[in-house]
A protein has these predicted regions:
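FAD-site-proximal beta/loop scaffold in flavoenzymes
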Residues: 1, 85-157
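Cofactor-binding loop segments of dinucleotide-utilizing enzymes, especially the Rossmann-like FAD-
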Residues: 8, 31-34, 152
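General small-molecule cofactor/ligand-binding pocket signal
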Residues: 54-56, 76, 148
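A structured beta-alpha segment of the ubiquitous adenosine-cofactor-binding alpha/beta core
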Residues: 58-106
Length: 172
């Protein structure tokens, strides 16, 4: 079977590598920015490629094609170009003036985006910035009484190891 994984983070790399290990004949990991913009760890990307994954960058999903039985048969993607770089150094993309590209596949795994619901924290007086809780290195949340935060809620998408380490710091 052929698999398309959509995303550029560690979960996307896990899905890509797991698909290969479970016997997929071809796995394409589709990401809308450049490979250097992926949030996955560099070694995860390199290991996925070493295992046979194809990393297709600067492509944004457009629509899924199904066969006459309703089964997935392709992912159509829109080529992207870099439009500019934001003040935080992140590249922004826009649609390229190119036709859609068809990527044949039997399965699509969507592994994009994760965020915390920060509204409730903000309403409780806990400072957030771009959806992440603002905490000190000790994991203490300034302006709160005995509130500590760590893991993805503070750093954004990262590894479980980092989240566990933050828990140990907060408990100390």
């Amino acid at each position: 079977k052929r698999v398309c994984v959509v995303g550029g983070g560690n979960v996307a790399m896990d899905a890509t590598r797991t698909s290969l290990r479970l016997g997929a004949s071809h796995v394409s990991c589709v990401y809308r920015r450049r490979i250097e913009d992926m949030t996955a760890l560099t070694e995860e990307i390199e290991e996925a490629q070493a295992e046979g994954a194809e990393i297709k960058t600067l492509f944004a999903p457009d629509h899924i094609e199904a066969d006459e039985n309703g089964n997935v048969c392709a992912l159509w993607v829109q080529p992207q170009i870099i439009s500019d770089v934001s003040s935080d150094g992140r590249t922004n993309v826009k649609n390229a003036d190119k036709p859609l590209v068809r990527i044949p596949c039997d399965y699509i795994i969507v592994a994009i985006g994760q965020s915390i619901e920060s509204k409730h924290f903000e309403q409780s007086g806990i400072l957030t910035k771009r959806g992440a809780i603002q905490a000190e290195k000790s994991c203490f949340v300034p302006g709160s009484k005995n509130v500590f935060a760590g893991g993805d809620a503070v750093s954004g998408p990262a590894t479980v190891i980092r989240a566990v380490a933050a828990g140990k710091v907060a408990a100390a």
